[in-house]
């Protein structure tokens, strides 16, 4: 079997995680935001929502540890608040909502005053309830040596030449990765959905003893979640076209800001989300925005989850470029919403069930790493989805059936933990070493 080039696993990554603050009764905290001056604990739309932002890290384990450090830092402060202890709500879905407007928008001043106007716009257009959802964003950047390594075993990569040519080639590779990630967004939602219970007070604030909604495994990624009131179509043929296809929605008044485009994947330059900067400087990284918080993990995500996302991006980066026309884009987004349903026997656009599609996708991912020289753990990737315990739907399990261990490793063989756990061959041990996994 061919030896794997370790450069195929070189990447930089970061995590962002939103969390609502609640009091000891599990109600939304109404106290002032305690971390307004902390760059690691950002302020999002609501005063009772925190956003954890890790540094850029060189491995899945490192970024997971960075998020855990921030999580524990916040928990220590919240526990000792003078107004009474507060806690981080562990779900993507909000707790009981007593009244509309329980998540007061933050007020920003000076250079950040535009944020207040923008958030008021979101409140007026979408309502405050939508802003109660929380989730996790995964950011990943591949260096030049990765693209060179992936081109040797896959169907994509970057060419050689001057710096300008390499940048254009890298931008094209990221555009291809974004297109393929959008095509596979349904798989990410399916494997990471962890929010099957949504109290009816979300729809009718103040209603008590309402029957929880059980239709969705991930409401925030479903038709009732973070979506615009139109179906966006993007241009993946060039970076110029990609930027212009988003800006057209702001120029015609459909959106107030590019940030208002609720889409599962974003291409970004370094720093704040700025499309003109993206146009000038090129793509720095890709952001995946459709990950639910896993309530079985102390910080909302297991380290295996991050490893799997990394490996999935490696696999998708290897896929050959192909056109991504409007019709396919719309089907991809509809499939993603479909995968957010609790019933994974629902068929996607190709006529196969969500579960059948997932088994097939994971088999193809396994075969890719085997061709590249790395072999997957014993039992392979494909049986993962099919091996869920009787009566347990895979979207609910994720990597979390039975909970996780103190070091963040999930003890189960069910769900997304399986591709990177279990008994491993020498080649898989090599992959673990390249990922800096102890």
Language-model region placement:
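Sequence termini and other peripheral, non-core segments
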Residues: 1-44, 327, 331-381, 386, ...
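Terminal catalytic/cofactor-binding subdomain
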Residues: 1-123, 130-132
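Extracellular structured ligand-interaction cores
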Residues: 14-16, 47-49, 133-137, 176-178, ...
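Histidine-centered divalent-metal-coordination microenvironment in nucleic-acid enzymes
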Residues: 18, 130-143, 285-293
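Flexible helix-coil linker/hinge segments at domain or subdomain boundaries
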Residues: 81-83, 182-197, 313-342
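Loop-rich catalytic cores of soluble enzymes, especially ATP-dependent carboxylate-amine ligases
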Residues: 110-128, 132, 141-283, 298, ...
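C-terminal catalytic subdomain
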Residues: 299-321
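Intrinsically disordered, low-complexity tandem-repeat regions
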Residues: 378-381, 385, 390-403, 408-409, ...
